[in-house]
Amino acid sequence: MMKMLLGGNETTRKIDSYAINELRIPSIVLMENAAISFTKHIGKNEDNFLIVCGKGNNGGGGYAIARQLFSKDKNVKIFCISDENMSNDCSVNYEICKNSGIEIFYKLEELDKLLLECDVVIEGI
């Protein structure tokens, strides 16, 4: 059985900082690896996803997860909290999602309908 280690926000920040600053792993690579790992644990019966994305690195992770799910032929919709002043990694993943044809919604009035249509909501704020 695989051993899983859990840590809080501060531990995660320290691990990320070490990986980025000492090991020189670009943060976008860490984000992509996290998205790939996350989507490996999605059940086969879940097909309709709503990913709510902010403008920081959590949002970037949400966009990366959206891309991974979309590549597995899942029905993916994104609700974008803001497309202004995004972190660099968030902006990169946002642009890839837009260019890939993933539906992105921006109006709060659309959120109720999106929530009713999905099986799973993923929060990336």
Regions found by a protein language model. Give the residues of each.
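Glycine-rich phosphate/dinucleotide-binding loop and adjoining beta-alpha-beta core of small-molecule
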Residues: 2-7, 46-52, 57-125
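Positively charged, low-complexity intrinsically disordered leader regions
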Residues: 1-47
